[in-house]
């Protein structure tokens, strides 16, 4: 299976995925990275791995569908004539909602990772929301993207404890450990993970 990474983050999970490819425990092939800024850590990881990179800047107030059409063109470029049905879009810290147009084109082919046990605490600042709610457990969710905000079909959820003295940083570290372990596993078995 082929996948393209969409990331606008430091790339912690992306780096873990690349390490699993390097040690051959993940046999899926990464065709490249799409990011919105050159200075993100994910771009550094892609560059070090020798992967093609496409930077698609996002301007404040830009129409979602117009931006998604640029993303779509970059995806097709990275696919180099491969059939769209042989490729998954793996969002790893992608901080933009997709338009209904984009979701309809890539239906059931867009994976996302979220740092909470959805449907609890969707959207940004999940760790802070978990702590504010005084939850005793948190975790991560890998799900398909649909038209909503973190509402798509859940593929995998893994839990971890939340301790009374946790901070956003300590909880984030614990959840990221789960994310780094499980995203490569889902990429290895997808699409059978949802059948």
Please annotate each region the language model reported.
Residues 1-4, 15, 31, 69, ...:
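Membrane-interface segments of envelope glycosyltransferases acting on lipid-linked substrates or membrane lipids
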Residues 1-44:
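N-terminal beta1-alpha1 ligand-phosphate binding loop
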Residues 29-31, 52-57, 109-114:
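Short hydrophobic/aromatic-enriched beta-strand-loop microsegments
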């Amino acid at each position: 299976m082929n996948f393209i990474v969409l990331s606008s983050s430091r790339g912690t999970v992306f780096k873990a995925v690349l390490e699993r490819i390097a040690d051959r425990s993940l046999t899926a092939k990464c065709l490249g990275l799409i990011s919105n800024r050159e200075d993100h850590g994910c771009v550094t990881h892609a560059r070090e791995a020798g992967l093609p990179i496409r930077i698609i800047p996002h301007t404040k107030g830009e129409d979602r569908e117009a931006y998604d059409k640029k993303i779509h063109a970059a995806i097709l470029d990275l696919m180099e004539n491969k059939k769209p049905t042989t490729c998954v879009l793996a969002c790893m810290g992608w901080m933009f909602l997709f338009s209904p147009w984009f979701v309809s084109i890539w239906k059931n082919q867009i994976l996302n990772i979220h740092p909470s046990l959805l449907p609890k605490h969707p959207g940004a600042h999940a760790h802070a929301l978990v702590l504010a709610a005084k939850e005793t457990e948190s975790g991560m969710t890998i799900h398909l993207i649909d038209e909503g905000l973190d509402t798509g079909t859940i593929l995998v959820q893994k839990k971890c404890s939340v301790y009374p003295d946790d901070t956003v940083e300590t909880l984030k570290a614990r959840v990221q450990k789960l994310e780094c372990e499980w995203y490569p596993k889902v990429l290895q078995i997808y699409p059978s993970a949802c059948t």
